[in-house]
UniProtKB/Swiss-Prot annotation:
Involved in the de novo purine biosynthesis. Catalyzes the transfer of formate to 5-phospho-ribosyl-glycinamide (GAR), producing 5-phospho-ribosyl-N-formylglycinamide (FGAR). Formate is provided by PurU via hydrolysis of 10-formyl-tetrahydrofolate. Mg(2+) binds at residues 263, 275. Residues 111-304 form the ATP-grasp domain. This is Formate-dependent phosphoribosylglycinamide formyltransferase. ATP binds at residues 106, 147, 152-157, 187-190, 195. GO terms for biological process: 'de novo' IMP biosynthetic process.
Length: 390
């Protein structure tokens, strides 16, 4: 099939689905991979492969089979040493094998930011057992946040306000770890005024920043996001300076092109680095309606060496997540018409089954200001009902 580029997508969730749509609009041929069949991105891709991204041999085999122009990781749990191997063989790993290695583990990216780049972060320590957790919490003070160095969507994260809750938090983190590293980060709880995601695009002509995205989390996972977030010019400048430092440092041996989701806490005028994702960010779903080029469009353009504007503008918009409440092998929906009556847009991700707190869709709304858009998005999300079982 004629195409402008061949992309191997490693991970096929809802963010991957939107990326596939953006890439295909630019003429790309996309092979979507995941550990289960009919994952969201597979439903819109040209071809698909089912494999574990933690199976090194399977990962090598799928790259050899398809020989892509770009290898695009969409998840954290990948054998990054294989990505380094294939990058050394001449494959273009997005944004680089080094970036995927560093950001797969919270300890690696935190140490890079705090120790090598001198970027402001919360106080933190690492722990491999409960005894070390107790010592780390004494160092950070209470409350503190405990989370696995490797997990996704906030799984395993908890806020601890007293020493008698440390064992429970450790057990929860261990139960939700990904990969084979039994290690957590214990960090100072920042009593922030708000938190933001700064979408940062590194492309052939330099770096482009999107307007800041505000977001609200529960259980360590995003529930709402809105753009543009109200933020002072000095605070925006500080966030941009830190984001540029980190994404530039992650180039490694690759091109380092793509979109990064850089998270910050903001307290007054102080901006504190939190985390970074070298791919489209879940809070950035709002850009599907807020920006003329969504985060997925920007990621595809940057990867493929296409033009990315130097300035991105956003109209007041918001997103609200639609969550499953229970486990079921079958799922259906009702209330779509009612959810869209107020002008909101609904994106159903097409996941084949449910479990508690699994993201099944998102409501998107625009308005005269972000408060109006947030209210509209939440109202729309509440009108879409998930049905479990036959």
């Amino acid at each position: 099939m004629p195409h402008t580029a061949k992309i191997l997508l490693l991970g096929s969730g809802e963010l991957g689905r939107e990326f596939v749509i953006s890439a295909k609009r630019l003429g790309a041929y996309v092979v979507a991979c995941d550990a289960y069949a009919a994952a969201p991105a597979m439903q819109v891709a040209d071809a698909s492969e089912v494999l574990s991204m933690l199976d090194a041999d399977a990962l090598r085999a799928v790259v050899a089979k398809h020989h892509p122009d770009y290898v695009v990781p969409e998840i954290e749990a990948i054998r990054t040493e294989v990505l380094a191997e294939i990058e050394a063989d001449g494959f273009n790993v997005v944004p680089s094998a080094y970036a995927t290695q560093m950001t797969m583990n919270r300890d690696a990216i935190r140490d890079l930011a705090a120790q090598e780049l001198g970027i402001t972060t919360s106080r933190y320590r690492y722990a491999k057992n409960l005894e070390e957790v107790r010592a780390a919490a004494e160092f950070t003070g209470y409350p503190c946040v405990i989370k696995p160095v490797m997990s996704s969507s906030g799984k395993g994260q908890s806020t601890v306000r007293s020493a008698d809750k440390l064992e429970e938090a450790w057990d929860y983190a261990v139960a939700n770890m990904r990969g084979d590293r039994k290690r957590v980060i214990v960090e100072q709880f920042i009593d922030f005024d708000y938190e933001i995601t700064l979408l940062t695009v590194r492309h052939k002509d330099g770096i482009t920043f999107c307007p800041p995205i505000g977001h609200r989390q529960e259980r360590g996972d995003y529930r709402e996001s809105w753009q543009p977030a109200t933020m002072s010019k000095p605070a925006i400048a500080a966030a941009q300076e830190m984001a540029e430092k980190v994404v530039t440092a992650l180039q490694g041996n690759g091109k380092g092109f793509g979109l990064f989701g850089v998270e910050f806490f903001v307290k007054g005028e102080e901006v504190i680095f939190s985390e970074l994702s070298p791919r489209p960010h879940d809070t950035g779903m709002v850009t599907s309606v807020s920006q003329n080029l969504s985060e997925f469009d920007l990621h595809a353009r940057a990867i493929m060496g296409l033009h990315v504007p130097s300035e991105i503008l956003a109209r007041p918009s918001a997103s609200a997540v639609i969550l499953a409440e229970q486990e079921s092998e079958t799922v259906s929906y009702s209330g779509l018409a009612a959810a869209m009556e107020g002008g909101a847009d609904i994106r159903i991700f097409g996941k084949p089954n449910t479990r508690p707190y699994r993201r099944m869709g998102v409501a998107l709304a625009t308005g005269g200001d972000t408060d109006y858009a947030r209210t509209a998005a939440v109202a729309a999300a509440n009108k879409l009902h998930i049905h479990y079982g036959d």
